[in-house]
């Protein structure tokens, strides 16, 4: 039994990437930052939806379900959408612009990587070859 396959590492990477949306929630805000209000609530809801979506996509990947890619792309889109209220909530709540910008940059790069792997036809075929074989 081989444990360190590209499929397994990709699944773990997908799950871990999804879990980083926790960084955008109020519980990860710097001490003293105001974390109440609609923008933080919207950030929390969208971030948790992205986390659940990435978790479901990971299960689909390991189960070799054809829908896992669509779920991963949808979760990435929801995660990208979560950055909008996060940016305003963080900067208006007292978070440093550097912290907000760093979190946004990391997540934009993750979304770019996921969508590139799953939407560029040559890369998507390679991913499918790694994930779907018997």
Residue ranges and their predicted role:
Residues 2-134:
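Membrane-interface extramembranous regions
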């Amino acid at each position: 039994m081989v444990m360190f396959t590209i499929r397994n590492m990709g699944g773990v990477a997908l799950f871990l990437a999804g879990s980083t949306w926790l960084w955008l929630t109020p519980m990860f805000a710097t001490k003293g930052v105001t974390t109440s209000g609609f923008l933080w609530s919207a950030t929390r809801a969208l971030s948790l939806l992205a986390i659940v979506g990435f978790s479901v996509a990971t299960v689909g990947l390991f189960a070799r379900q054809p829908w896992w890619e669509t779920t991963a792309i949808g979760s990435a889109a929801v995660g990208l959408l979560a950055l909008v209220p996060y940016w305003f909530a963080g900067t208006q709540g007292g978070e440093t612009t550097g912290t907000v910008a760093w979190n946004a940059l990391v997540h934009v790069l993750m979304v770019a990587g996921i969508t590139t792997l799953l939407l560029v036809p040559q890369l998507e075929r390679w991913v499918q070859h790694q994930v779907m074989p018997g």
